[in-house]
């Protein structure tokens, strides 16, 4: 049975959601708009992954500074700077300026995510952590929904710059939620982390985090708009209405976050009950099969159904492994988050680089299936023992 989320969970998740608007809009819009501002395809991949590369360092910086400085202050500063960076996306077209802005966003996100997730973990009983992490992910990903879907719609109506500037202003509303969250963190969530790091389960946790990050947030998020454009052109007929490809891309990517908001708590509760070994195997296998089928299917209906199934698998995997990592303390979570970010950083570069080499965006799905196979074997070998 689902339990009611705490005030800390709800308020930090809401602040996180508001902070994500500009970042997520950029993932939906830049693959469609990069030629107008003079960027090359490989530069798109670099910009959409730069924030993740930076987090390989800043995740550990966040973990260290949380022990020394007030977490509320660090969260407020990160949310404020993150909102202002959306204005840089809106009004600058220089690759160098955009690259600096994306790196700074990576710094902000390291603090926002680490402080929020560890705050949820420190206020939750261990046996319910998957469910509470599902609530946090579900609520926070409302920001992804609005950033992607509303961003796509507003892009077709008012343009790239105005959309991102508007999202930057709205993101400042995250600050009051952070102030009222009653946030606390604990350095004593568990005493298991030093022993855990010596086991193959720890290695598998990092491998799985890499695979989850590289496929969903990396490959799919950064290339789906271009896949749609190459398959269907600039407009499609959707249930009797002609819509722009940016709107369609926003709707499809937004489905992921709608499903996350509605289903993440349930997925987390199920995996709390059946265990990470069985749950991870099911999700990796189904996701792998779906991506192979997406490579073969050209129909819009088939692509839509396949993406929905893939998103559900990704939601369950993210909730399960995030809960497993946060259960083991700040240091383990920081390293797991870095593994996810490493995968998410490689994803756009691999996807766009493969397109330049192979010449077909559909190859992204084959790459995704291969990475999920690695995750599947890692989880199978390391999480077989009784949990």
Describe the function of each predicted region.
Residues 5-32, 201-220, 308:
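Pair of pore-lining "gating" transmembrane helices in MFS-fold secondary transporters
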Residues 29-42, 222-246:
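Short amphipathic helix-loop junctions that connect adjacent transmembrane helices
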Residues 52-60, 144-145, 257-265, 344-345:
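Residue-level signature of mid-helix packing/kink "hotspots" within the transmembrane helices
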Residues 57-89, 271-274:
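Conserved MFS/SLC helix-loop-helix module at the cytosolic interface between two early adjacent transmembrane helices
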Residues 73-87, 168, 278-292:
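Structural signature of the two symmetry-related core transmembrane helices
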Residues 111-124, 316-329:
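Intracellular juxtamembrane helix-capping segments at the cytosolic ends
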Residues 163-179, 364-380:
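Symmetry-related core transmembrane helices of the 12-TM Major Facilitator Superfamily/SLC fold
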Residues 277-321:
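C-terminal transmembrane helical hairpin of 12-TM major facilitator-type secondary transporters
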